[in-house]
Curated annotation (Swiss-Prot):
It comes from Pseudomonas fluorescens (strain SBW25). Disulfide bonds: none annotated. Residues 1-29 form the signal peptide. The gene is opgD. Keywords: Periplasm, Signal. One of its GO terms (cellular component) is outer membrane-bounded periplasmic space. The keyword Ribosomal protein does not apply. This is Glucans biosynthesis protein D.
Amino acid sequence: MHRRNLLKASMAIAAYTGLSASGLLAAQAWAGNRAADGKAVAFDFESLKAQAKQLAGTAYKDTRQVLPPTLATMTPQNFNAIGYDGNHSLWKELNGQLDVQFFHVGMGFKTPVRMHSVDPKTREAREVHFRPSLFNYEKTTVDTKQLTGDLGFSGFKLFKAPELDRHDVLSFLGASYFRAVDSTGQYGLSARGLAIDTYAKKREEFPDFTQFWFETPDKNATRFVVYALLDSPSATGAYRFDIDCQANQVVMAIDAHINARTTIEQLGIAPMTSMFSCGTHERRMCDTIHPQIHDSDRLAMWRGNGEWICRPLNNPAKLQFNAFADTDPKGFGLVQTDHEFASYQDTVDWYSKRPSLWVEPTTAWGEGSIDLLEIPTTGETLDNIVAFWTPKKPVAAGDSLNYGYKLYWSALPPVSTPLAQVDATRSGMGGFTEGWAPGEHYPEVWARRFAVDFKGGGLDRLPAGTGIEPVVTCSHGEVKDFSVLVLDNIKGYRILFDWYPTSDSVEPVELRLFIRTQDRTLSETWLYQYFPPAPEARKYT
């Protein structure tokens, strides 16, 4: 049939059926999809929430399967070499802006994840069953004769035009982990559906997304909806992800309904996982050609009272956990602020292109805390930063909770303070006058120097002669030797000060700084955790 006649026919049938032309094409694509081969069953979010609630009232069943030897013993290189056949992509027949492909089970991915395609008009779902014909094994050593039965999948990835079937922009793989890219196309930090007992007396629990349901989008849509069922020994959950793949960012609106099977010591909402090895202020693990190595450089918080917080990340010598109490936070996230290649000199992992991740609550979260876990790491392949929201009210068996929030995967958060922001933090030897770096004579008294740069917020428009006052507090020791320097290159200011110990304590020093003029606050609040050396190490020679 001629393309124009096909369009006319589609519009005529659409008028008869009540579907739009694009909706009809989407329905046709769903009906004829070669990936979804299961029987049609009714599906909606209300039924999924009921299913999750009912599941929480039953004993947990570990669904990890014994994989065939060819999959159980495979290397990461072999696993990554398994390719999905683009001819069997979920929305191949739609020939639209989005498409979905699935990850194979194998290696440590043993939990079979069930996938379903949903017709948004009829609300009927069909399962996509695993079969080897969906994948390409030519570049692997996989013995396909061992691949018998419905092994399920381990996750999925999303593609966006014009690079359908080439470069994915979003992926869900392993437990409840997922991540997305911004305009650079570079993956970075990850998010999770739920965190349980990350920093608790018992072992951390990693819930699994065990099933997904994908609503078929309209042909020209860059937005789609996916539902997920979460399961673990301590909790179940029903999730709705409204995912908008914009030109410069991916935005997810998440509606999470969580049911507690057991009492949960620490529940982590909107958890995110990142890596910080070294940066401008932390050089302990930076003996490489790279000036900085990190997926994120700070935890940013917009508190419920309106205060903006910048907390630079650390790679501590021993595990550190910090809780920042709040009520109805306006947002928080792990941010990669520096996107200059020169700051990383990296042509493999491209840290200069890594996105930030910002959480924006869309429901009232009440009292709780933004928690930050920093774990020692010796290399960039090990994630060592975790951040999430923990409700103040204890979670007991039988409790049901609902959290709504948006996730923004973008170069920088979608919102920022109107005040000056921290541009960079630096730390080094103290106790001497700038311009007279120790050579023949080191300082007689040991100290640690900090340089905090502020920019934006109208600092470049302050009247000449405006007095800039740094307000600094510390949990122990003392701070002095203040300097306020003009930085023309960033149209801002550098605050210099030294910290001096007043005891032998090696407890972390909690530093807090903002700048003001007279009674007007000029900047967000800088929080920093410094780890002083042992008394015998407080010397320069």
